[in-house]
Amino acid sequence: MALIAKTRPQAALVLADGTVFQGESTGAAGLTVGEVVFNTSMTGYQEILTDPSYTGQLVTLTCAHIGNVGVNPEDMESNAIHAAGLIVKAAADVPSNWRARQSLPEALKDAGVKAICGIDTRALTIHLRTTGAQAGAIIAKQMGDELTDEDLQQALEAARSWGSMAGQDLAKTVTTDHVYDWTDGSWEPSREGEPAGFRRAAVFPYHVVAYDFGIKTNILRLLADRGIRVTVVPAQTPFEEAMKHQPDGIFLSNGPGDPAPCTYAIEVAHKAIAAK
């Protein structure tokens, strides 16, 4: 059985500066646009894709072969794929891991996420490193349809009209819409008669309020591993409202977009520092 499909639909990545990389689609068909960035991690593609911090970005993974271990529900950093698109050299269609529930291409298609493979990601990364992050568009065709000059022009126009991350407040688009408590720790394999799963501390001597500006579940798990019960609140929660939970501390998560327009977050930080 082939681990990588021999035939895929045609696709292209078009940068705002006019640079074109033609390859093949390994996700959903259609057009997507965003800021083209790269990540040099050797592992963790599922965590990267589901990290809310990558909202609005087309993520290039420099590791040459992506998708070997498939996708599973335990390694999600949120409840959905947040990256606007994925760019890889080679994508595995058949995963090889006992935890896998789907292949990466299947997960991308189910989520409607556009992705391109078969391009020189090293050349793209060097180009981005030299010119800086810029907007781009992935256009992916249906199987059997030809990629045309009109498609490339459409992608170029979409990339050039997208703009940049500057001034975009994306935190309020990815934050939770309700308050919730978190006590699940990190996932561990079975040991000493215990089944595999998420661990939970016996006691929680500390309580922290975490502001969700695009928080990853792994951050919450690591806090829980240390005996910290976390109350997660929406990004625009007033500081005074957060303090009604009587926490031992305040945690401000990272998130997507430009922090400058997030005046509500800046105000919380100022008040938390002043409160000591």
Segment roles from a protein language model:
Residues 2-245, 257-259, 267:
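RNA-binding accessory domains that recognize and position tRNA/RNA substrates
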Residues 244, 248-249, 254-276:
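Cysteine-nucleophile active-site neighborhood
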